[in-house]
Every structure is written in C-alpha cells, then in structure tokens.
C-alpha cells in the first residue's frame, strides 16, 4: 500500500491561514505528501524545512530538494528541532506541522519489522542506523518493565500475561514469532482487531521514545513560532492526542500565582490560542482505513503575553 497523507488539505490550510509566503517546517516529512501540497501553495520566496530520521524518507526528501530550491531536508528527530534550526540560522518560523503516524511503507515493508501482518526481522526502529532493534530490546528489558510498557503505551489490559509469555519465549527474531506469542497469550480478541496490535504499538513507542520526543518537541515548536504562527499536529492514538491536548491547554490557560500571604492572582503566561480540533472524515476513512483514528489539533502563537 502506498502512503496516503492523512488530513492533507485540512493540515496545510490550517497551517497557512491564507498566507502564501513565509518559513515553514514539516517536522515529520515521511513520504512528503504534506510538504508537496504546502510548497504548491507558497510563492517563490517561501522556505520549507523538513525533518525525518527514516532512511527511505530521507531519499525521497533529497530528490525533492534537488527539484525545488525552496526546500531543505534535515536528518534529525523533531525532538532536536530548535537546535537544528538555530544551527542553520533560522530563529523563527511562520508555521510547523507534524504527522505523528507511522507511514504505510514502514508498516508494509516486512524488513522494517513494524508489522504483525507480515513476517520480517523484529526491528521496529524508525532510524535503523542506530539503537537497539525490538529483538535486542526484548532480550534486555525486565518482565515487569515490559508489562508496564505494554499496559501504558499499548493500553493493553492483559499486559502481564503477555509480558510473561514474551520473556519465557527467550530470543525472538521475527515479527511473526512475536505476534504468535501474543496471540496465544491473549485470552480474548477484540472484533476486527489483531490481538498483537496493542503490544506492537507499545514496543514501537518504547524503542523509538516516541512520546518522550513529542514532549520535547512541542515546547520547542512554540519557541520557534512567530506571533500568529500556527502549530498543526496530527495524532493517531489517544496517548499522543492526550499529550498534545494537555500541552495546548497548559499553554493557552492563565496560571494562578499565590504570593506568600497574598490572595491568588492570575498570571498571564499564555503562548498559544486554540484554533481547532478536526477529526478525519468518513470519506477519508473509506478511502484510507488506516486514517480512522486520526485527529488534527491546531493552535496559534499569541502576539504577546496576554494578547
């Protein structure tokens, strides 16, 4: 299955807010769907920078950079967005978008080791040039820690039973082996959902530090935004969406300050204004079933504190 960009038009339109020029960042280039559309709507003076650490995504991005001088790809995690932009002399931008989902090519290529539907080496690394593979990580992790990770990151109620079965199995080399162990250990299957879905998600999140990276990325993104600059982020599961929701809520809410012996006063430290929350349409889900859980949250940088 080729990669289909989710919430494509909604994301780019929310990011631009009727502008046709400026400096923008695609924090998760993937296969470039959002970036291509963004570039098509910008004038010749605009600049678009993109981040990715997936080798195949970087190949696609390098080809685009050859075609379009307005575009630059940066081989790095979006968790390093502020440092990397400052290294190239960019202190502020007009908009930042991020699509937090795993791309279809990553899921569909068995050799990447993300999918329980196809047999392949048990890898799951976004950047397969460094770090532990899922197979190596599963050998090292303690059973209790694994159970907690499957419960927390996979929201899997049967995490302890599954973790015990995985650790008892010893060395695992393929996704099919792991999927079979989870399937056997799982006492009850959800309708239309493979029993290994939540466990694979949890392991992928853990070895790629996905939620940690999101927590680091969000405040840096706001630091980089110019006044009225937009932040548009697509999430695909409740853990991601909750982080984004809580961050935007915190950055758009007055805080209480109670000085010693003094009545509480509201202090305006707001940096963001909520713009919208958009759910993927039924039509898009029919065309691309993998988009079914997608949400887009959009916020705008305030001009100044209390603006």
Curated annotation (Swiss-Prot):
- Record EC number: 2.1.1.199
Q: Which GO terms describe its biological process?
A: rRNA base methylation
Please give the family membership noted in the entry.
Answer: Belongs to the methyltransferase superfamily. RsmH family.
Q: Does the keyword Cell inner membrane apply?
A: no
Catalysed reactions, semicolon-separated: cytidine(1402) in 16S rRNA + S-adenosyl-L-methionine = N(4)-methylcytidine(1402) in 16S rRNA + S-adenosyl-L-homocysteine + H(+)
A single Gene Ontology MF term assigned here is: rRNA (cytosine-N4-)-methyltransferase activity
Q: Where does S-adenosyl-L-methionine bind?
A: 32-34, 52, 78, 99, 106
- From the Swiss-Prot or TrEMBL record, give the protein name: Ribosomal RNA small subunit methyltransferase H
**Protein origin, superkingdom:** Bacteria
The record's listing under PANTHER family reads: 12S RRNA N4-METHYLCYTIDINE METHYLTRANSFERASE (PTHR11265:SF0), S-ADENOSYL-METHYLTRANSFERASE MRAW (PTHR11265)
Sorted UniProt keywords: Cytoplasm, Methyltransferase, rRNA processing, S-adenosyl-L-methionine, Transferase
Entry's Pfam families? Methyltransf_5 (PF01795)
Q: What is the lineage of its organism?
A: Bacteria, Pseudomonadati, Pseudomonadota, Gammaproteobacteria, Moraxellales
Function statement: Specifically methylates the N4 position of cytidine in position 1402 (C1402) of 16S rRNA.
* A GO-annotated cellular component: cytoplasm
Subcellular compartments: Cytoplasm
């Amino acid at each position: 299955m080729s990669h289909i960009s989710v919430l494509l038009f909604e994301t780019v339109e929310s990011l631009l807010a009727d502008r046709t020029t400026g400096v923008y960042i695609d924090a998760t280039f993937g296969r470039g769907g959002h970036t291509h559309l963004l570039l098509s709507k910008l004038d010749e003076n605009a600049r678009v920078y993109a981040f990715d650490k997936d080798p195949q995504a970087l190949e696609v991005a390098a080809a685009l950079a050859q075609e379009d001088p307005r575009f630059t790809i940066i081989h790095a995690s979006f968790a390093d967005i502020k440092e990397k932009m400052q290294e190239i002399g960019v202190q502020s931008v007009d908009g930042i978008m991020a699509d937090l989902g795993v791309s279809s090519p990553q899921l569909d290529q068995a050799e990447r080791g993300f999918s329980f539907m196809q047999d392949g080496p048990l890898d799951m690394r976004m950047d397969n040039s460094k770090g532990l593979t899922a197979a190596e990580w599963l050998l090292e992790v303690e059973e209790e820690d694994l159970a907690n990770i499957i419960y927390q990151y996979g929201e899997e109620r049967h995490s302890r039973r599954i973790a015990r079965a995985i650790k008892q199995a010893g060395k695992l080399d393929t996704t099919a082996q792991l999927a079979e162990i989870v399937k056997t250990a799982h006492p009850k299957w959800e309708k239309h959902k493979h029993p290994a879905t939540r466990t694979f998600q949890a392991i992928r999140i853990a070895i790629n530090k996905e939620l940690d990276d999101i927590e680091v990325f969000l405040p840096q993104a706001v630091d980089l935004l110019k006044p009225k600059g937009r932040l548009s982020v697509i999430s695909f599961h409740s853990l991601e969406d909750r982080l984004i929701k809580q961050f935007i809520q915190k950055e758009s809410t007055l805080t209480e300050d109670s000085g010693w012996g003094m009545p509480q006063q509201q202090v305006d430290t707001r940096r963001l204004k909520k713009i919208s929350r958009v759910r993927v349409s039924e039509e898009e889900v029919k065309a691309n079933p993998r988009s079914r859980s997608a949400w887009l949250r959009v916020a705008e940088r305030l001009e100044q504190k209390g603006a």
